[in-house]
Amino acid sequence: MRSPARDATRLGRLATWVVAVIVALIAVSRVTGLVVDWMWFASVGYAGVFRTIFLTQALLFLAVFAVSAGALWLSGWLAHRSASQAQAWRPEVLGQPVGEIAARVPWRAAIAGVAVLVGLLMAVGELSSWAIALRYFHQVPFGKTDPIFAKDIGFYFFTLPAYLALRNWLLLLLGCSAVLAGVVYGLRGDIALVRSPRGLSPAAATHGSALLGLFFALQAWSYWLDRFMLLYGDNGVVVGASYTDVHVGLPVLWLQVGLAAAAAAASWANMRWRDYRVPAAAALLVVGSAIVLGTIWPALFQRFYVKPNELQLETPYLQHNIALTREAYGLTQIEVKPFPVEQNLNLAALQANRPTIDNIRLWDLQPLRDTYAQLQEIRTYYKFLATDIDRYQLGAGYQQVMLSARELEPALIPANAQTWVNLHLLFTHGNGVVMSPVTEKSAEGLPSLYLHDIPPLSDGGPVIQEPRLYFGEGGKGYVIVKGSVPEFDYPKGKDNVYTAYRGRDGIGIGGIARRTLFAWHLGDPNILLSGYITQESRILLHRNIRNRVRTIAPFLSLDHDPYVVVSDGRLYWIQDAYTTSRWFPYSQPGTGGGANYIRNAVKVVIDAYNGTVDFYTSDPADPIVQVYQRIFPGMFRPLGAMSQDLQRHIRYPEDLFLIQARIYRAYHMEAAEVFYNREDLWEFPRQLTGMSTGNTPAARMMPYYMILRLPDEPRAEFVLMLPMVPSQRENMIAWLAARSDPPNYGKLVAYTFPKEKLVYGPFQIEARIQQNTEISQQISLWNQMGSRVIRGHLQVVPIENSILYVSPLYLRAESGQLPELKRVIAAYGDRVVMEDTLGAALAALFKESAPAAIPAQGAANARAREALAHYDRAVERLKAGDWSGFGAELDALRPLLEALGAGAADERK
């Protein structure tokens, strides 16, 4: 017969072994993860970044663990040492079964174990504070101060977050110490809450008073820190310290600092008095003041004094919010210029602005991606994940183009072919890009292709010498290169072409130890068991470019749209990265994450073949990136170190521009009274897109790239622009442009229209398009014939001092997936036309500006007929898209018109 004691012993040993095995597995997984991370960071040239982050986390972990465990152990040990020994372990005091448990507890070991366990948990919880610690120790000044406390903005970015993190940890540590001491005293019988006599033993009262004093001292410091948090409050009209905060909240916080400090002193004095009324009175005083003075009194003051005089009292604080919000988002750099809207556009002006006309985008992102997919994906496992917009200097001149990388998606490989070898050794990379001009189309309504097929062929586009993409917007899994299995490169007829990776990326996994390491880390035993892995084999990790950049630089925020670039015969990805913060005083939060400061401080370039990642500082004046340069020396290079060709492709990022435009809707108003009354609030225009079914929902217009010549500028350039309309109105009031070409990269310009002139907004143009009988009848006819009409995005095109509107129209078979560009709608002034091509639409739009023959005799009459003939031929050339012929006819027309004008003047004399 087995003894229950022996069974209990065996069960205890089994439980110990199970726990030990679990802990060992967790430890092994953690260690292997660290080793793999170290190897990967070293392979991409950023071992220093890994070392800095790891050592900071290790030091932070050890410091927090040592202090936390030490403080917890000290609190528990003092409680154990001071507890009333006479009452210890007596079930009649504690009751059953608590008394029996207390009698068996190995107190010293238990207290040490709890201290170590809780200390470990607290240390793990503080690991994420490594960036706060590094920024604190490497901070730089902003050179600007806040208007209330006159502290440098850098204090709020780098010091205040560290103080708040320290406060939160200390409060948690103090709370855990109090709980541990309370449990010890309770189990030892020093706290009687049920049995008589109720109360605390002298030792428990002394210990509790000491801890309560520490709490009040921390609370005093917390109130001191809360003064600075007033700069982020939203109790007034806008974010930031309001009149009530400054004149009521701030004095109250100083009073609460004093009350909490007095309560701390009283609590420590009570260690001698041991009178529960002292800490009770102190707690009541602190809590009561927080409720009455910190909550009720400011609310009453705001309601009955500030609210009736809000504009007068809040004006200085409104000005603080306006000025600092504009500073935080870079809006102070916006140059405001008038746009007179003369609306005197004609064919000659179009010819003078050919770079703009030649680059009006007729292809929307989604229809073009659908067309690329049908024409150029070649095989089911290729995928165009995104369509990008850029500009290139090509044979036809400075052109805006759209392009998409042909990436390999393993999930699209047929299910019966998704073997481990195929997924990780055979299908390793995508191939090439497709590129097309934004304005051109074929006779069938399909895009003209500058780059197409596999391997990529160039028809007027740049030449690609290395088209393979091992790194891209897909690339979710790992691949192994240089194995005994040749890598699939591209299909050729009925056969396939194979290749071998010759790039620099990858971690060697030829040895058995490394194969075991990666098999464990990735949870894939095939890495260890496969016979296709050789001594030269290498594993490529983090092939998704956003994941790759985020792994190296987790402290940067990334733009949603990395874009592919063809440069010097190779493929690169450019990823815009931001430094952000939520600690800019008085600044209005403008992102979903609550950030109220943003700079596009870094441009990241990733080689699509080699996987190399280079960080370039595009805003070296940003204090946050200066701090990171001090933390990670050598990581960031100046933008001038980027190759000249790649520099031609940097562009103003969409996410940043969108955030700035949203803030600028209200914060273009710099006068406090105008801002308070929202007299000139702007909004993004509405427009119609998608299927034309008669009830197409309206959506807000988003920023778009285009090539145009800004007013008073000598040449066309690549800009990101967005029109603006007044709030709850549809007429256009301004347009905002961000310049992308050197040397004006990053400059923002707001062009404002005269308020006395009506300028049609996009939604008003959309309404006029829908009201046009010919256009609506044609769309209805197409829809009835089994086709689906897709309305493209309307583009506002500023030319000279006029506004032109252009919108593409696509047709797609009801059961098909191939959109075709069938019509172009153009509007100018009061006219709306729809034609087969952009040239034909412009010719029809400006047909009324044909020169009228002056009724004269002889040579003048002949010149008039000749001028009209040249004009008619110019219109025909424009319809055909023959811009050189169009220009030649206009050049021939000019002297005839001048002669006619001179003759008419002579007759008037």
Curated annotation (Swiss-Prot):
Ranges annotated as spanning the membrane: 16-36, 58-78, 114-134, 169-189, 205-225, 246-266, 281-301
Keyword presence, Membrane: yes
Pfam families assigned to the protein according to its UniProt record, in alphabetical order: UPF0182
Key words of the record: Cell membrane, Membrane, Transmembrane, Transmembrane helix
A GO cellular component annotation in the UniProt record: plasma membrane
Membrane protein topology class: Multi-pass membrane protein
The keyword Transmembrane belongs to this UniProt entry's keyword annotation: yes
Compartments where located: Cell membrane
Main location: membrane
HAMAP family recorded: UPF0182
Family that this chain belongs to: Belongs to the UPF0182 family.
PANTHER family assigned: UPF0182 PROTEIN SLL1060
Protein name: UPF0182 protein H16_A1615
Protein's organism: Cupriavidus necator (strain ATCC 17699 / DSM 428 / KCTC 22496 / NCIMB 10442 / H16 / Stanier 337)
Record lineage: Bacteria, Pseudomonadati, Pseudomonadota, Betaproteobacteria, Burkholderiales
